Amino acid sequence: MKKEDPIEESRRYVENARKTLRENAKLDPEENRYQDDKYVKAAGNYLWGGVLIALDAVFHVKEGRKRVDINCYRSVIKKRDRKLLGLVNDGYEYIHLYMGYDGSLSKNLCDNSFHIANEIIDKCAIMLGQKPELIA
């Protein structure tokens, strides 16, 4: 069986997150806020999962099925790419905490989270010798 390309898989997670927000979270255009935090949380978790797949492909931090602490990623990334470290720190805060745990209803925060996730995935794609999807 052919192994999935981790960058393609990461981007699939991003699209699933985008689809979840678009179809289920009920955007109020007047307030520029989503109405249902359940779907914002789900989208945040999909998005963070996609980021972790890309990071694992480059840095090989994950061992088996054991959960890896964010500090393990930080220590490995810090040695290789400080800009990526900043993005991962922002991603952890915006995507994992604000979206995934808190279910922040702000569309601006969610849009920024997608931008951060795509930047991280693109940097990982470059490190793997692949073409980035978007460079900001």
Stretches found by the model and what they are:
Residues 1-136:
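Terminal alpha-helical segments
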